[in-house]
Amino acid sequence: VPLKHQDHYDVVIIGAGLAGLSLARQLLLASDRLTILQIDKRGQIPPVGQKVGEATVQCSGYYFSKVLELEEYLLREHYLKYNLRFYWKTAGQDNSRFESYSQSYIRGMSNVPTYQLDRNKIEEELLRRNLETNQYTFDLNAINLKIDLAQADDQPHRVSYSVRGETHAVTARWVIDAAGRAHVLQKQQNLERKNAIKHGASFMWVDGLLNIEYLTDSTNREVRLNPQRSHTGHLPFWLATNHFCEEGLWWWTIPLQGKTSLGLVYDAKLIPPATVNDPDLLVKWVCEHFPCFARDLPKRRVLHWACYRDFSFDCAQTIDRRRWALIGEAGRWTDPLYSPGGDLISIYCTLVTDAILTADQAELDAKVELYEQLQKAVYGAYVPSYAVSYDCLGDQEAYTLKYVWELTIYFGFYVFPLINDLFTDRRFVVSFLQRFSRLGRVNVSLQTFLSRYFHWKKEHREPHTEPIFFDFYEIGGLGVAEKTFYKIGVSVDEAREVLDQQLANAMELARFTAAHIYAAVLGDPAVLRNRSFIESLDLERLTFDEQAMRLHYAEHAASMEPYPWKWNPEAAWRFVTPRKTPSAVAAAMTAGV
């Protein structure tokens, strides 16, 4: 750490968590001239306890490994991640054995690698690397913070704080709030906003590796030779972010070196937080709801536990032409399902880095306006997934349809631009936002349709009595989106063509999803091939009403022309079960099932 502080810095970063440390490293890699002061009120970086955000997906995996140049370190000190896997209990079984659970997954590894991160270790490494440069100054124990933001373009911001009784006062061209849920600038600028996501989380570290494949009374040989592997393959399931699902909730298992991260995320309308708000209660709840964990979890030593009563929040603004910005949990934050936190850090830090490196004020003004629109759009697209159709977690079919739709959009509209450095090209961003807005309207409609189907199915369809194994790539639209991983170094015109292809692919997938639900409700797979009917679907105004759906299809039932699908339209048909008898429906409604 430099022995002497400067009076002025190009950038002052408030907070030294994953977002702030990542931004500092990205800036230091981008310029050998920028001076950076980073301060944190805590006395130790990283802290001792657990932090959520341990799993990465493709955007964040690429960002940390390639953009921040940590690839060799990640492979050496952390685990390579084996995708996301999802599990559901099987009706009529006690579900005390892992092999009793249905599974949806991607069998192969991602060509854009992802990682399971020990947050404390990676933050320690980022800080170590930042401190190797003489452009970087770092202060712990920074309290009595005061920020006076500049009111004119040619004025600097003023930041003061004290460390162990010594006051420091500096000026800065840029001030970045990365102080997490302290929301320093959100509160100061009156930017705090709520959103429609009301989910809590209770999570912990336990000692050692909790290997879910051995939550069984089968022998090692029986586990190795289980015929289910003809579907699932041989890669170690424990390397995945594993999700054990029920309506409106999921329980994760994430491997870290020497320990396992476990956590429950839940809709607060369905689970009172008081029932899971300490480690003993959490273990008890999990062993009751997912009985296979009773074989192992009560024997584990809890290393750390924490909780959030309200995980997600919005923010009115996250970047300003007068050279301040909010990143990470200091700004907009979503639900942890799909591990989007690292992605938001990756995208926001990239936009903020580009803004900081922009010297011309007129150019900065244009970029800031566009980047704020982009950040709102990227964040806003997540909200229906969490606020509208979270209940679909309770059914393998409904959730598989939901996840394939969301992952297809993610691959084509999040991963593709990020790995091509396109989010900082204004020509591309304008084109992106135009196309993304069309997807947004369909997304809201489809998420509502999926949720209604889930609730209808609970009442009207028999549950599965044997496990089902489903690879998400069996629905062909996802594979089309994954091919964008290999479209690298494209021009803006070429990128627009890719977006158009991906928009068409997503619309085709939305059409398939709606048609599948119609066919399942009507109990007739012929619905999936009726071109006249399928082309009549209004994807932006899908309405779930069984009688109206029957009448809608009847208008087209006589048509014999098949729809020209590019993949198997019956890919998800094995999820469809017989209808319940009228007495079973009445009993289910009485029981609230």
Label the predicted regions:
Residues 3-19, 37:
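Beta1/beta-strand and adjacent pyrophosphate-binding region of the FAD-binding site
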Residues 19, 44, 182:
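Conserved Rossmann-like nucleotide-cofactor binding loop
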Residues 28-52:
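Glycine-rich FAD pyrophosphate-binding loop
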Residues 46-95:
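N-terminal FAD cofactor-binding segment of flavoenzymes
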Residues 106-128, 271-277:
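Short beta-strand to alpha-helix junction loop
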Residues 129-291, 349:
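Predominantly flavin-linked oxidoreductase catalytic cores and closely associated redox partners
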Residues 241, 247-249, 257, 267-390:
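FAD/FMN-dependent oxidoreductases across multiple families
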Residues 356-593:
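C-terminal helical "tail/cap" subdomain of flavin- and related membrane-associated enzymes
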